[in-house]
Structures are given as structure tokens and as C-alpha cells.
Amino acid sequence: MRFFIALEIPSENLPQFQSIQTSLHTLIPQSKITNLDKIHLTLAFIGEQPDQLKDQLIQIIQTAVSGISSFEVTPAYIDGFPNLHHPQVLWIGVKGDIDKLLLIREGIKDGLESLALPVDERRFVPHITIAKFNNHFAINRGLEVDLEKLMVISFDPIKISSIKLFESVPEEGFHKHNSLAEISLKS
């Protein structure tokens, strides 16, 4: 299975992402918009691993969230990887209870390392991918200003009450995300 651990964005928050994506696609028609049913905030991409690892991954998540109560993050700014001027990915960064998010991420990272699984060592930037580009795309200063204007809407906070283990399944040139387990945070 191809595993990843993420925060699923609640359905009540999705219309605001859809609004941003619609405006984004108008500004940059060649952008490949992320399907709303795939909108999430990844905490760890684990990749292809044996199916029997599932129970150990669930245990890692349970340990990482132990004692952590529900919290909120709010979409706040737009950026890109590797950078906003030549993005392969456009994403929305979040603000709010980032300390809790980072604490969970570190717990997951420690658990993955204890199983000798590869862990992304780059600085963790909590983000929600909204679009991708197939080719090298350049964003000039004018377009950058237009993208920043997309974020002037007042986003509703996203209530984080659980962490999910997903599998990513190739399907007709895309990947379908199936939820394998949901681990609730403390109420």
C-alpha cells in the first residue's frame, strides 16, 4: 500500500477552497486544480510499504496524538513549492494552533523513524495543496499580487478533531485517497 498520514479538511470548509481554486483557474488556466475530495494537510508521506504495516502506523498516530485536544487552524496565505515564482505546486498555508500541529508531526516522525521508515527531513511547512503544474511555470510580480488578492477572503477556521491514515491508489492516471483509519483527538 502507498500510505500517508493527513488532516482531512471538513466538508463545511471546502466551499471556500473551491472559491479560491475557481479564481485561481481563471488567473492561471493551465493550473491543474486539486479535486475537492483530495484536499488535505499531509503530516507524513510514507510511500509504498507492506500492507501489514497498517496497524503499526495506526499505533504511531495514536501515540503522537495522545493527550492532544482538538484545535483549529485557519488558511492564511498562498505560496508554492519549490517557490512561488516557479511553482510545481500552489498551496495555502495555515495559522492558528500550529504548535499542536507540529507536536503531532514530530510524534509521527519519531514513530516512523523507530520503524526505520524514510522521513522527509526538510522543514515541515503545514500546507494544503490547491493546484499543480505539469511544466515549469513562471509567476511574475503582477500575477503574484493577483494570487495574494485571492487570500483576502476571511477563511473560517478549520476544526481539527482527528488524524487519518490514508492509502493512495493509482486510478486512471490519478490517485484515489482511501481512508484506512481515523484517530480522534481528545475532546
Regions inferred by a protein language model and the residue ranges of each:
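Histidine-dependent nucleotide/RNA phosphoesterase domain, centered on the 2H-phosphoesterase fold
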Residues: 1-187
